[in-house]
Amino acid sequence: MIQTSETAQRYARALFELAQDKGDLATIHKDFRAFAALIKTSADLRKLLDSPAFSRDVKVSALAEIAKKAGYSPLFGKFLGTMATNGRANDILGAEFAFDQFYAKQRGVQRAIVRTAKEMTGAEKSRIESLLARVVGGDVELTSEVDPSLIGGIQLRLGSKLVDASVAKKLERMNTVMKGA
């Protein structure tokens, strides 16, 4: 899970409020998600954002070019430029995470993360999502992650609650019990 700095949260909150005032939340959310996906898949972009070897001016112009070519909204392009100008380019992913949380809360959607040892099918994801929606009494957006170290079973996080029904956790509990015996 991404950790967000207080600064990243402040930038995200400012963008969220501005986008909300302009009625542009969905567009900004879409742009932010697309840009975050780009960061996650491009080692060069991560290096640009994280490295102090690149000047702020280089970062600003590179981000402006990316925003232009990707067709991001002008507001989102300005946001990226502002973060780079203020030396916060390395906080963009944290700001995206915070923005995403604000957006979900505004829409009344709860987020859940499910981790399994192997990729889940669409039907499995849908079933878990519908079960969670019934439990929480509202909409749930499910994100799935693959973690082979779980061996089998499932880990489910909804808000601050974690249900760990993985084989790895069961083996860990058995090991603890056996050591105590």
From Swiss-Prot:
Where does this chain mainly localize?
Answer: membrane
Q: Kindly name one Pfam family recorded for this protein.
A: OSCP
Q: Which Gene3D superfamilies does this UniProt record tie to the protein? A: N-terminal domain of the delta subunit of the F1F0-ATP synthase (1.10.520.20)
Q: Any S-S bridges, and between which cysteines?
A: none
Which keywords does this chain's UniProt record carry? ATP synthesis, Cell inner membrane, Cell membrane, CF(1), Hydrogen ion transport, Ion transport, Membrane, Transport
Q: Which InterPro entries does the record match to this protein? A: ATP_synth_OSCP/delta_N_sf (IPR026015), ATPase_OSCP/d_CS (IPR020781), ATPase_OSCP/dsu (IPR000711)
Which Gene Ontology molecular-function terms are recorded? Answer: proton-transporting ATP synthase activity, rotational mechanism
Supply the PROSITE patterns for this chain: ATPASE_DELTA (PS00389)
State where the protein is found: Cell inner membrane
- Protein function: F(1)F(0) ATP synthase produces ATP from ADP in the presence of a proton or sodium gradient. F-type ATPases consist of two structural domains, F(1) containing the extramembraneous catalytic core and F(0) containing the membrane proton channel, linked together by a central stalk and a peripheral stalk. During catalysis, ATP synthesis in the catalytic domain of F(1) is coupled via a rotary mechanism of the central stalk subunits to proton translocation.
Query: Which family does the UniProt entry place this protein in?
Result: Belongs to the ATPase delta chain family.
UniProt-listed NCBIfam families = ATP_synt_delta (TIGR01145)
Summarize the subunit comment: F-type ATPases have 2 components, F(1) - the catalytic core - and F(0) - the membrane proton channel. F(1) has five subunits: alpha(3), beta(3), gamma(1), delta(1), epsilon(1). F(0) has three main subunits: a(1), b(2) and c(10-14). The alpha and beta chains form an alternating ring which encloses part of the gamma chain. F(1) is attached to F(0) by a central stalk formed by the gamma and epsilon chains, while a peripheral stalk is formed by the delta and b chains.
Q: From the Swiss-Prot or TrEMBL record, give the protein name.
A: ATP synthase subunit delta
Q: Recite the lineage of the species.
A: Bacteria, Pseudomonadati, Pseudomonadota, Alphaproteobacteria, Hyphomonadales
Quick one: which gene encodes this? atpH
